[in-house]
Amino acid sequence: MPKFKAARGVGGQEKHAPLADQILAGNAVRAGVREKRRGRGTGEAEEEYVGPRLSRRILQQARQQQEELEAEHGTGDKPAAPRERTTRLGPRMPQDGSDDEDEEWPTLEKAATMTAAGHHAEVVVDPEDERAIEMFMNKNPPARRTLADIIMEKLTEKQTEVETVMSEVSGFPMPQLDPRVLEVYRGVREVLSKYRSGKLPKAFKIIPALSNWEQILYVTEPEAWTAAAMYQATRIFASNLKERMAQRFYNLVLLPRVRDDVAEYKRLNFHLYMALKKALFKPGAWFKGILIPLCESGTCTLREAIIVGSIITKCSIPVLHSSAAMLKIAEMEYSGANSIFLRLLLDKKYALPYRVLDALVFHFLGFRTEKRELPVLWHQCLLTLVQRYKADLATDQKEALLELLRLQPHPQLSPEIRRELQSAVPRDVEDVPITVE
């Protein structure tokens, strides 16, 4: 049988004392139950933390007590109803039930508030420059065609050829619209004629996806749209149309509206200005549909050129599109606005191909026999060309330009142009190699 091992610390004491002795013993009774703290941390700061639910209750009780005190002492009127929590993305505007706004409209309104003075102020035009530009304007300009004119021509073609169904149609066939479609887009027309902010009708947003989008657009009467509706329409068509179709929208809808607004108010509405900037999303269509037709019309005023030119200055434009536009402007018949656009494009300091530079030089050399007094804008454009690209000119071009200065002088600008040309090293002059003996 194994030996019994006594417990440690007991010594010679009895294993179990009598119950009476245990009760009477003072060291056997504990004063209280030991509190166990598990998972509460050791810092007092954590024990004093108030949870979010308790915080809300405290604030609610404090608010109720404050309202009771104000009502009891008569220091406050009827407590105001709790204000609904709203997320505001822009400045407050009076609206009639238009809670859902377009995602970019608050940004546009904020920009209008910040820059309204700059764009709504009248453009300062020098009378002398304006008279000089009018001398080079086309005296018999071609009639301006709008989208309505082209649609009516196509409708007339369709009516004359309706008898021969299988014949070759020279124009775009214009099918008759369903009466329900006409009713829908006449309703869209009413919305766009009064549009200020908010979302556009879904029927209008799907127009770029339609094959006969021009005919549908004609039903909505773009000339009756508000400026804000024109901006939103430009956003939609610039994003969803192909470049060729976007060019037609710019040329037939946006450009006539911009020119009419400038001619009537002597300034451009801010929303139309933003529409011109948004149209640069497709730079090729912008040049072919807005800038080039504006120059080719021969009736571009100085005010129009300054407004459109400011967009060229502010926006980034790919070099290929700018080079093609400069080449086209240099080869067309001259008008005063051409010098403004060329100077602004030259100031962007692109690495232009030699073909474009040669076309620009020939453009200026074509004025050697000009009898009319050239405007200051023409001399400023020539100075910009020489300052930016004097190292890319050939020797014969440099000599021809010096001869041009003698034939078409300007008292202030010609000496500066001559100094730039004389200090430049032509591109066809090679460096003399250094020989070491």
Curated annotation (Swiss-Prot):
GO CC terms, sorted: apical part of cell; chromosome; cytoplasm; cytosol; intracellular membrane-bounded organelle; membrane; nucleolus; nucleoplasm
Gene Ontology biological process:
maturation of SSU-rRNA from tricistronic rRNA transcript (SSU-rRNA, 5.8S rRNA, LSU-rRNA); regulation of protein localization to nucleolus; ribosome biogenesis; rRNA processing; stem cell proliferation; trophectodermal cell differentiation
Q: What is its main location?
A: cytoplasm
The Phosphoserine modification is found at S55, S98, S167, S414
Q: Where is this region: Disordered?
A: 1-105
Task: List residues modified as Omega-N-methylarginine.
Answer: R40
Localization (cell) = Cytoplasm; Nucleus, Nucleolus
MF-aspect GO terms:
RNA binding; snoRNA binding
What is the annotated tissue distribution of the protein whose record heads this document?
Found in the placenta from the sixth week of pregnancy. Was localized in the cytoplasm of the syncytiotrophoblast in the chorionic villi and in endometrial decidual cells at the uteroplacental interface. After week 10, the level decreased and then disappeared from placental villi.
Matches recorded under InterPro entries: Bystin (IPR007955)
Describe its function: Required for processing of 20S pre-rRNA precursor and biogenesis of 40S ribosomal subunits. May be required for trophinin-dependent regulation of cell adhesion during implantation of human embryos.
Q: Any further remarks?
A: HeLa cells lacking BYSL show a delay in the processing of the 18S rRNA component of the 40S ribosomal subunit. HT-H cells lacking BYSL show trophinin-independent signaling through ERBB4.
The protein in question is named Bystin
Q: In the UniProt record, what gene is named as encoding this protein?
A: BYSL
